[in-house]
Regions:
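Chalcogenol-based redox active-site neighborhoods
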Residues: 1-156
């Protein structure tokens, strides 16, 4: 499925790395940034998420909640979050349903790995509407954070 700007964000429930259940529709009233990433402990993913960590005060100041999402297990994400001192939730899409729902799943990734999340960014506004959607085919690229921050600032 391809997500289109202006459509309601598909609802989902996933567990975070501390085993809390997170349901998207429960987040209405907050602007959200969903960041799908291929795999924990890889260089580009680490750089991307550490950049968010280092700038989390920006997101907090504009009342935007950030979630990282990958197909890694809860345990892998917990270790990754701890080792990188990440200060926002990481959600496990181990069964790949949400990555698929958001059009963010490689059928075949490098080294013949199947079912890895594509690096993607989605902004969902307070009403649950998709305001930004960027799905990257090249896992070594990062989302356009300049556009993301400008849009989020406008949604305050």
């Amino acid at each position: 499925m391809n997500i289109k700007i202006g459509q309601p964000a598909p609802d989902f429930t996933l567990y975070d790395s501390t085993k809390n259940k997170i349901t998207l529709s429960d987040m209405k009233g907050q602007n959200l940034l969903l960041l799908f990433f291929p795999l924990a402990f890889t260089s580009t993913c680490t750089a991307e998420l550490c950049s968010i960590r280092d700038n989390i005060s920006f997101y907090n100041n504009i009342n935007a909640k950030v979630f990282g999402i990958s197909v890694d297990s809860l345990h892998t994400l917990a270790k990754f979050k701890s080792e990188q001192s990440l200060n926002f939730p990481l959600l496990s899409d181990f069964n790949k349903n949400v990555s698929s729902l958001y059009g963010s799943l490689y059928e075949m990734f490098s080294y013949n790995m199947q079912g890895v999340s594509k690096r993607s960014a989605f902004i969902i506004d307070k009403e649950g509407i998709v305001r930004y959607a960027e799905v990257l085919e090249n896992a070594s690229e990062q989302p356009n954070f300049k556009n993301i921050t400008l849009l989020l600032e406008g949604l305050k």
